[in-house]
Amino acid sequence: MADTPLTDRLDRRTLLRGAAAAGVVGIAGCSGNGDGGDGSDGGDGGDGMDGGDGGDGGSTDVIRWHAGGTGGTYFPLSGEFEGVIEDQTDFPVEVSSTGASVENVGSLGNGDADFAMIQNDIAFFARNGERLAAFEGNPVETLRGVATLYPETIHVLLNPDADVSSLSDLEGARVNTGDLGSGTQVNALQILESAGGLTTGDFDEQNTDFTQAANQLRDGDVEAAFVVGGWPVGAVEELATTTDVEILDMSDAERQAARDDASWFADDTIPAGTYGGIEEAVDTVSVQAMIATRSDFAADTVEAVTEAIFENLDQLSIKSEFIGVDSAQDGMSIELHEGAARYFE
């Protein structure tokens, strides 16, 4: 797509915008009436288990985009996507704050969301029905990928008074591992076990969203909290301006152990000065953030949304240095939606 002449792209966009104007009431399968009241039983897309991509589905007045907590990166970046999509197409977009990856996959699977932000590892688990209780033996066969975006960095935030210098030092500590059932919790438990030798009985597990985890650290209610998001994470920035906080600098051995246990982890580094009071670079690991959708969501709409985002990257300010056409399939862990594939081919 990137090599297509500008005039051809403009003509194509005109056609897509026309399709949007003509088809805005039929853009989503299993979408209900757009008010969230009974979104799981609208249309005739069913559960999508035996269908291909791009069904015409039911009716909706808005693209329902599920993001994450307001203190993370998913929510503000989704707000920027909303602005670009509404500016470049005739589709209205509604961005919702959610518990992020695991919840978002469930919303896509039952038709309550049309697009969602998720982690690439959670996408793999959900599509293949493994490793997570929410999906074990019950794969979300309608889950489809749109694009990967940027590294989702694992932040292990520490109370400076806790005297923690390694993951194994968290034995017996109060540790917030993220929202119950979230991708953050999954990553935290994986890392604590593989790199720290700790299972859930070895520490006092707490479960809240990013913002509440920051509050717990500020109030001294936990010794450590896991936050997963592209740096700088808003909740961490805010915490660092009001509270002394440290971020665990993972050793080479800890990072290697995490990578050996889970292939979706990659080495990552939080640059010095990213957060107030953190004067040195912090070594850690990361996963990938991605946009996902449903197999029964209209291919023309997915293509139009994908094109709107990737042809207007200059309008993004959050994570724009990582998001691009050339890297949009790096770490893609599930099958692409037909509409996204048409754009990137």
Please place each PLM-identified region on the residue numbering:
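Terminal disorder- and signal-encoded targeting elements
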Residues: 1-134, 140, 150-153, 160-169, ...
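Short, hydrophobic alpha-helical packing/hinge segments within bilobed ligand-binding/sensory domains
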Residues: 103-105, 213-216
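Short beta-strand and adjacent tight-turn residues that come in two discontinuous sequence segments
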Residues: 117-118, 208, 226-228
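Short Gly/Pro-enriched turn/cap motifs at secondary-structure boundaries
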Residues: 146-147, 280-282
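Short, well-ordered beta-strand elements within core beta-sheets of diverse protein domains
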Residues: 158, 289-296
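Loop-centered beta-sheet repeat module
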Residues: 178-198, 207, 214
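Short, conserved secondary-structure transition motifs
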Residues: 209-215, 328-336
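Charge-rich, low-complexity N-terminal segments
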Residues: 215-228
